[in-house]
């Protein structure tokens, strides 16, 4: 079994700043992390590990994205970094194109993947479009918003998963190969062992440019291949509302209700004329 996991190095959302002049995210000097939803994909690969095989992690980004791959290598066998200036400024369409070509090349070099994992979305873009875009380009069955891998039948070429939706949880079965987009799952995120960390530090990362990944049409990459235009990025204004705690000591339920209702009307600027019946 061969598993490919797409990850992304993103700015730590707790420390993101917006340039007031360009209205874009200021990435310089902001700590980076592995996209949190990618961690669940890395963890779920253990559900398939009993069948043997290999795990390849893939990311597209600048040379500094190697740091994220080093961390992911603690639970993977190899890492591929897709990096070149032609990829800069890619939107979801251009990103899914480049990653799909890289996955196809990974299949040629290391074996066709049985499962491709992506996060449901990244915390810097929040589009949830790249995973389905890859599946479409590679003609893969796709299982989205998956919370758990239930079972894998490698002989029968089937996988069963739990998918979370607004209506509840669904149990779905799919044929392999397929693409899975992961959201926060039920498994706890575990750290690799010290031996895993040492192995990851010594491992050689495969670095590909566009030509290495089999990309011939550069007009589909980067800004030239990105029809999406972001006009403005901004932080929402701070909300003036604050929580207020009501002291319940030695107060009757009626007193508490009256105080609560009075507070609601006071905040809305409307005078309350409601009164409780003494009975």
Swiss-Prot record:
Keyword annotations of the record: Electron transport, Nitrogen fixation, Transport
Keyword Cell cycle: no
GO molecular function: electron transfer activity
One GO BP: nitrogen fixation
InterPro entries with a match to the protein in the record: ET-Flavoprotein_bsu_CS, ETF_a/b_N, ETF_b, ETF_beta_N, Rossmann-like_a/b/a_fold
Family classification: Belongs to the ETF beta-subunit/FixA family.
Complexes and interactors: FixA and FixB form a heterodimer.
Function according to Swiss-Prot or TrEMBL: May play a role in a redox process involved in nitrogen fixation.
The name this protein goes by in its record: Protein FixA
Organism of derivation: Rhizobium leguminosarum bv. phaseoli
Species classification: Bacteria, Pseudomonadati, Pseudomonadota, Alphaproteobacteria, Hyphomicrobiales
Gene designation: fixA
